[in-house]
Amino acid sequence: MNKASLLNCQRLRALLALFFGASGTLAFSPFDFWPAAIISLFGLQLLTLNRTPRQAAFIAFCWGFGLFGSGTNWVYVSIANFGGMPTTVNILLVILLAAYLSLYPALFAALLNRFFAKTNGLRLAVAAPALWQLTEFLRGWILTGFPWLQFGYSQLDGPMKAIAPILGVEAITFLLMALSGLFVLAVIHRKIVAGIIAVAILLLPWPIRHYQWYSLLSEKTVDVALIQGNIPQSLKWDPKMLSETMDIYMGNSLPYIGKMPIIIWPESAIPSLESYQRHFLTKLDELLRNQHTSLITGIVDERAVGDRDKIYNSVIVLGDKIPYQYPAAIRYDKYHLVPFGEFVPLESLLRPLAPFFNLPMSSFSRGNYIQPQLSVAGYNLTTAICYEIILGEQVRANFKPDTEFLLTVSNDAWFGGSIGPWQHFQMARMRSLELGRPLLRGTNNGITAVIRPDGEVQAALPQFTRNVLVAKVTPATGITPYARWGNWPLWIITVSFSLFALTYNRRKS
């Protein structure tokens, strides 16, 4: 078999697609090898050339299975440890998740090869990024969405970082797809100009990476203490563990009450209903107010709404000027819930099947999409709980011109020592960069950190330690272009590219 016929072998292309897809995981934390994003997308574009739509879809499906099979297999940790099902079923569920997510690259390739079959710049650098933006949008929207492993996040430590505060992370992904297509064109048709343009797209943002779209308010620098309780997930919701959990958080907080204006506990740090803890919260609030310290804590709440009782994953503030009364006046209720973790679709059918569909606290209700900022010790904080921090448009929608900090609290203990918490942390850093605000990130077992407005890590605690992160944090002001306009400019570009590609293609036909 000669070289040309070997490269045309569908099975070989599928195997190579698996490899190129899996290599994309190296672009994300904790590996942080940002060139892997370009290599992976280059492989996807190259291997789907000169194929029928069905063949291209299968190759792209294999590419997606390589990416998501290697990049999201951390979900196995929570399924295996807390799902209560046989190992074979656990593995099957992880495979099904990767296969589902792979349908979106398959759709991308099928459409690309259906409407833009020729190997030219129109296909590779114009139509491909526009179609990719569309299919990635669908992946982040259908069935509440799972926009994990978007390649734009890989550029936090790469040369295209400066694009984030201007057009957002999705625009970086768009540009990565365009320049990878130009590299394919340069290799296939030996067009050096295409390669030069690709390198220019990659490097031109580099000189402005240190441009500040924000101003630091040095006179408002504040001391913050973030408590990392490191409570094992297997014990977190055990009623017998409640008293010990409270002792851990109180014991680590008492040295800072009266010394730190702001103390932060992580998501559901108080593993009990707020209504059950009124006495404890009232006494703690009195102590905090007397010592001029405010506490932000995660807690669960059950409230009557109409003729139903609804459970919310909440953040509340204690130590405010107004004494605490149930329910806490200054609060945030999580809006975007995680399927199976925080709510169960078709629950009457699924809950009886296995413990995985009946996890503790998996019956939450949504808060409102837009909610007031948290007012804490005279500062305004835009808040996101756990998974919500990966949803750039939701965070931006709640962001206000007078926001001084971003706040996210999380509990990644579900995923143990896997790469999942590191990917989550990377996406949280991107929100700081996009919006030009410091981020305070409080977690149960890591990664607890303070992020500067440029997305860089100011301070962080090691994972799986019981510790306190103390930091002086300077708030910021100013509006980045992304904070002002969101993804609208990118969608205008996407529609323009799509119309141009379709019109030009029709004329040529």
UniProtKB/Swiss-Prot annotation:
The gene is lnt. PANTHER family: APOLIPOPROTEIN N-ACYLTRANSFERASE. It is an enzyme of class 2 (transferase). The active site is at residues 267, 334, 386. Signal peptide: none annotated. Belongs to the CN hydrolase family. Apolipoprotein N-acyltransferase subfamily. GO terms for biological process: lipoprotein biosynthetic process. Its main location: membrane. CDD domains: ALP_N-acyl_transferase. Catalyzes the phospholipid dependent N-acylation of the N-terminal cysteine of apolipoprotein, the last step in lipoprotein maturation. The chain crosses the membrane at residues 12-29, 57-77, 91-111, 124-144, 168-188, 192-212, 485-505. This is Apolipoprotein N-acyltransferase. Keywords: Acyltransferase, Cell inner membrane, Cell membrane, Membrane, Transferase, Transmembrane, Transmembrane helix. It is found in: Cell inner membrane. NCBIfam families: lnt. Pathway: Protein modification; lipoprotein biosynthesis (N-acyl transfer).
